[in-house]
């Protein structure tokens, strides 16, 4: 009887511990670790860095991830960029997702503290900003001067393509057309 009770208590303790670990927020690499790895890879591979600030609940972030993961668009982007992702803006009650530790500091230092998601910054291999996703007023993004997030409208796509020309000057016209076409087919007018 004592061994059955002991086994039952051990089983309950294991189930309880498993439940606690399943409900705890995940531990993500720190922003410093993500950026150190991205800079190391970018320098070794002679690429720039595409830094993406996103959140699990963000629909446009998922659309941008689909763009980066697409079999046609992804390889073009990967040819020129090492992608670094930092999760920010997660909801405290969400036990399945967490912010990347320390991600708010680089977001703020890159002038994206008030930007929507995704907030995109293209950096050189040393981590120096080249361009970000704040659309210039001259392109008539709505609203002007704001973060484009996922490039879906013609002005947003135009700005994203200008970002690429600045941060990936070796992007060929054929590659640029393929990316622009991909975004235009999945965007909104």
Residue ranges and their predicted role:
Residues 31-49, 77:
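A short beta-strand-turn-helix
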Residues 53-68:
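Conserved redox-active cysteine motifs that mediate thiol-disulfide chemistry
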Residues 22-26:
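Boundary at the C-terminal end of the N-terminal hydrophobic targeting segment
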Residues 136-189:
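Thiol-/selenol-based redox modules, centered on thioredoxin-like
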Residues 1-8:
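Positively charged n-region of N-terminal signal peptides that target proteins for export
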Residues 70-74, 78-159:
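Thioredoxin-like thiol-disulfide oxidoreductase module
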Residues 49-51, 58, 83, 120:
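Hydrophobic beta-strand anchors of alpha/beta hydrolase catalytic cores
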Residues 8-19:
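Bacterial N-terminal signal peptides
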């Amino acid at each position: 009887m004592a061994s059955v009770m002991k086994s039952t208590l051990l089983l309950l303790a294991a189930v309880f511990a498993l439940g606690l670990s399943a409900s705890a927020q995940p531990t993500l690499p720190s922003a410093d670790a993500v950026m150190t790895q991205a800079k190391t890879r970018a320098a070794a591979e002679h690429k720039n860095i595409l830094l993406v600030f996103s959140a699990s609940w963000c629909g446009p972030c998922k659309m941008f991830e689909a763009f980066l993961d697409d079999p046609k668009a992804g390889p073009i982007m990967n040819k020129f960029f090492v992608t670094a992702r930092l999760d920010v803006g997660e909801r405290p009650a969400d036990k399945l997702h967490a912010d990347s530790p320390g991600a708010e500091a680089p977001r703020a230092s890159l002038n994206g503290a008030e930007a929507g998601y995704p907030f995109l910054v293209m950096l050189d291999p040393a981590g120096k900003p080249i361009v970000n996703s704040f659309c210039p007023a001259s392109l008539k993004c709505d609203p002007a001067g704001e973060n484009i997030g996922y490039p879906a409208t013609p002005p947003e796509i135009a700005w994203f393509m200008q970002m690429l020309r600045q941060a990936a000057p070796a992007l060929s016209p054929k590659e640029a057309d393929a990316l622009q076409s991909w975004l235009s087919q999945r965007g909104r007018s």
